[in-house]
Each structure stands twice: as structure tokens, then as C-alpha cells.
Amino acid sequence: MTSLVSLENVSVSFGQRRVLSDVSLELSPGKILTLLGPNGAGKSTLVRVVLGLVAPDEGVIKRNGQLRIGYVPQKLYLDTTLPLTVNRFLRLRPGTQKTDILPALKRVQAGHLIDAPMQKLSGGETQRVLLARALLNRPQLLVLDEPTQGVDVNGQVALYDLIDQLRRELDCAVLMVSHDLHLVMAKTDEVLCLNHHICCSGAPEVVSMHPEFISMFGPRGAEQLGIYRHHHNHRHDLQGRIVLRRGNGHS
């Protein structure tokens, strides 16, 4: 399968501070990659590298020519005194036609919000509107920066269900950034745990294997949420230095 974006041994420094070190990944059509990591781990920098907004100091980046990217930001800041409906907000995107708006909203099951004030939307509704905005670009790559932030568990399940549906319909690659170090979308194809470098990677463990989780969130939640178990051979000290775990040597 041809990758839309591939990074090979990419490193980024800001001044004397190394933010990313030897990071490699591939984003392929129809595949979901979830990026996990603590605050300050370099997740936002890595997203900017993928988007072409930050050039690496070392390593190789390959992108499909004329790649169309849809981006959903982590937060949306709006002036609460500014009268702005969902319709007007979406039309602010350059190149958007009036006739594109309602179909995009309907695609994310948010057609009923077209005349709603942006400031009155719930967290889940806001994420759907931002997702509709990203779809206006007919993306080959969908980048979602912490899409479930501020959304309750039921909203997360519905959002993950929608993301899975969209990646199948569009056959697009999905890069999802998560602040939750353990709970991820079950249908993620690969999880990368980042702390300036890739600490570990693998597939999420499907939540259906955890009866106590199903009893808490129901069978539908079990289908859409997964637990990722980290397998690190090291830890990071307070200065960010790598310390190998016992049995793996010392540093």
C-alpha cells in the first residue's frame, strides 16, 4: 500500500532543545494511526511536521503530491459577543460554496445545526462542525488533534463511530492525537506512544475483552473504545533523560 505521508528518522530541535528524535511513521489510505503521549512530549510538533508547517533538522519526509488535508484543531476560540451561526462559520473557509455546507453537515449527522449559534454548541456538536469543515476539502488525510477533548463518554463513542465511517467512505488516512494515555479508539490500526521519541507502538486491545468496562459503558462503547497497554523498556526522569528499566541495562 502506498503511503500518503511517511517520516523516516525525523528529528526536530528548537534552539538547544531536542523536541523530536528519530521518529518514523507512515500514514496510509484507510488506516487510522493514534498518537499518544504526555503533555510536552512533542505531539503538536509532530503534527506540524506532518502538516508541512515545521521542517525537520534531520530525517526524510515523503508526501503524496498535491495531498489534500483536513484538519480539526484541538480548541476553537471564538469571541462570545460575535453573532456567528454554523452556516456562516463554515462559509469563512476559503473556496467554500454555499451549496457545500449542508451536505458536509449531514455527513457528520449535524445538518440540524446549520443555523445554530456557534457559541451555543456543546463539545460534541462543536467537534462535528469542525469535522464537517475539514471534510469540505475532500481530504485524503484527516488530522484530528484531541477530537474527544471536552466530550463525554457517550459523545466519544458516537464520534469514534463517525470517524470510522468516514475513513471507510473516503478511504482517507487518519492521524488522531489523544491526551488519554490508555483509552483509544478500538478500530485504530496502530498506536504510537511518543515522548520526544517513539517509546512503543502496537494495536489497541479491544475493550470487549474487559467485562468491567462493558458493564460501565455498554456493548456499543466496547466496540468503539479500546485500551492500549504500553510496553516500554525505559522511563523518563524529571529532566527527560531516558532511564532503562532493570534487566535492560542502565543509563
UniProtKB/Swiss-Prot annotation:
Residues 5-220 form the ABC transporter domain. One of its GO terms (cellular component) is plasma membrane. It is an enzyme of class 7 (translocase). Its EC number is 7.2.2.20. GO terms for molecular function: ABC-type zinc transporter activity; ATP binding; ATP hydrolysis activity. Coiled coil: none annotated. GO terms for biological process: response to zinc ion. Its main location: membrane. Keywords: ATP-binding, Cell inner membrane, Cell membrane, Ion transport, Membrane, Nucleotide-binding, Translocase, Transport, Zinc, Zinc transport. ATP binds at residues 37-44. InterPro entries: AAA+_ATPase, ABC_transporter-like_ATP-bd, Metal_Ion_Import_ABC, P-loop_NTPase. Disulfide bonds: none annotated. It is a peripheral membrane protein. It is found in: Cell inner membrane. It catalyses: Zn(2+)(out) + ATP(in) + H2O(in) = Zn(2+)(in) + ADP(in) + phosphate(in) + H(+)(in). Part of the ABC transporter complex ZnuABC involved in zinc import. Responsible for energy coupling to the transport system. NCBIfam families: PRK09544.1 (NF007090). The complex is composed of two ATP-binding proteins (ZnuC), two transmembrane proteins (ZnuB) and a solute-binding protein (ZnuA). Belongs to the ABC transporter superfamily. Zinc importer (TC 3.A.1.15.5) family. This is Zinc import ATP-binding protein ZnuC. The lineage of its organism: Bacteria, Pseudomonadati, Pseudomonadota, Gammaproteobacteria, Enterobacterales. The gene is znuC.
